[in-house]
Regions:
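Sec/Tat signal peptide C-region and signal peptidase I cleavage site
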Residues: 16-21
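Central antiparallel beta-sheet cores of small beta-barrel/beta-sandwich binding domains
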Residues: 22-122
Length: 122
């Protein structure tokens, strides 16, 4: 009986550790190539539990906000409202935290996804 309780407690503790969100709070920078040129980005993230918030600054579209942000372990997702050819669009991001780098996949509209890496900025 005690062995079963101990095993259950261990499994519960391991589950809590695995679900812990990576702390990516702070400034991150990166760039990706588009058909019209290089787009430089600055992301300022805040993490509260599993909720991801913050701001973005694009050399192409200007400032925006992080919306619908979630982070679970090393996996994250969020959306960014933007404009394309004068029309409002929603850019969707998914990503994987890799220490001081995050691999992001960015999609919007009928365009193929952009994959790029951002780096923590000190």
């Amino acid at each position: 009986m005690i062995r079963k309780i101990g095993l259950a407690a261990l499994l519960l503790a391991m589950g809590c550790l695995c679900a812990h969100a990576a702390d990516i709070s702070g400034k991150w920078k990166g760039k990706f190539i588009t058909p019209v040129g290089v787009n430089n980005y600055v992301y300022n993230f805040q993490v509260n539990g599993n909720v991801l918030t913050g701001t973005t600054l694009s050399s192409d579209t200007g400032p925006s906000v992080v919306q619908n942000g979630k982070i679970n372990g090393d996996d994250l997702s969020f959306t960014e409202p933007a404009h394309y050819n004068g029309n409002p669009i929603t850019v969707t991001y998914t990503g994987k935290v890799m220490g001081d780098k995050i691999k992001l996949v960015r999609t919007f509209g009928p365009f193929p996804p952009d994959t790029f890496v951002i780096t923590r900025s000190n």
